[in-house]
């Protein structure tokens, strides 16, 4: 039973408009890791497996709540580079919905690129850019493979803490 599991690590998901929630839950269940989905009041999320935390609507409310809950060794699933940077600073693992791992080696570059893109949008006044392309089965497979590797690594490194 998962409630009896001694492994203290958890998976936290910034679940607002997150296309990989079900994949995360399936793998969390497979590996007996507790999962917490965070969303704001503008999104309705139901789960038979995960704990669901609903945070009041507001800019970055979910992000701040997620960061406050993270403990060293936990996994954070978010498409927000800022959230990922804060997760890494707490000794957590972080992954983007694309399957790309955020690391201490790549996060500064990603934040810089985000800043440059935002600055360019302000200069050109292009605020309504085309959204991401439609998610494919390959995207889901790529995420699933990368996420499972991350879970296995986190479990192996967290076993020492039990």
Give short role names for the model-derived ranges:
Residues 1-8:
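Short, Lys/Arg-enriched N-terminal segments with co-localized hydrophobic residues
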Residues 10-162:
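Nuclease catalytic cores that cleave nucleic-acid phosphodiester bonds
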């Amino acid at each position: 039973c998962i409630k009896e599991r001694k492994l203290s690590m958890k998976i936290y998901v910034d679940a607002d408009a997150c296309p990989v929630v079900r994949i995360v839950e399936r793998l969390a269940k497979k590996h007996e890791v507790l999962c917490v989905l965070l969303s704001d009041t503008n999104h309705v999320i139901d789960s038979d497996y995960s704990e669901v935390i609903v945070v009041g609507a507001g800019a970055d409310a979910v992000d701040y709540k997620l960061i406050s809950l993270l403990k060293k060794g936990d996994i954070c699933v978010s498409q927000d580079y800022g959230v990922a940077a804060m997760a890494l600073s707490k000794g957590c693992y972080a992954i983007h919905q694309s399957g790309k791992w955020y690391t201490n080696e790549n996060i500064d570059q990603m934040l810089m690129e985000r800043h440059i893109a935002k600055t360019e949008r302000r200069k050109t006044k292009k605020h309504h850019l085309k959204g991401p392309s439609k998610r494919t089965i390959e995207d889901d497979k790529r995420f699933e493979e990368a996420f499972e590797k991350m879970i296995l690594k986190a479990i192996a490194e967290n076993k020492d803490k039990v």
